[in-house]
């Protein structure tokens, strides 16, 4: 305990650097063998977590954020199989930009966003239980909502898909892993209801690791079998 104030003293023993947010989605999509074209900004948001390794307990998080500006980009001319939007609502992506991207793309669209005013009629929207509770009632009835509920599984079109029972160490980035697997398996099978159980398996692997986690080749084989 710090003699200067009633707070713990931390001794640094190990430092790990991991990509998060949209970059975590990109890395996990690539782990499935998908070629990814990413639109993002140069500004960075750093989340520095302090973990007590003896008890696997997070003690503190410090956020370091550059001044965030809305994303400026030229739309790519290549052909793509899917559009994936990962938006933590930090200011990079406006609602107007999301609608523009969805209108531009001719194919399946997947959105994971903390915003509540989303184009639910034109895209698959992955949100968590807390985000779902904040939606307007008319949006809650959309057939395109994929609601992740942690240990209670995933709800889609009135059906619940059970979660995989594992020892949870850290849920950080698990939604990114779920989204990446969902996109890959949807492109493989063409059905969301077929892709969800596989995505649940991927998320179950992610939560057994600290911080954001990129699926290994072994993990991918486990998910897909």
At which residue positions do the language-model features occur?
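Glycine-rich phosphate-binding loops at beta-strand->alpha-helix junctions
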Residues: 89-93
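A short beta-strand/loop micro-motif in the catalytic core of glycosyltransferases
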Residues: 123-129
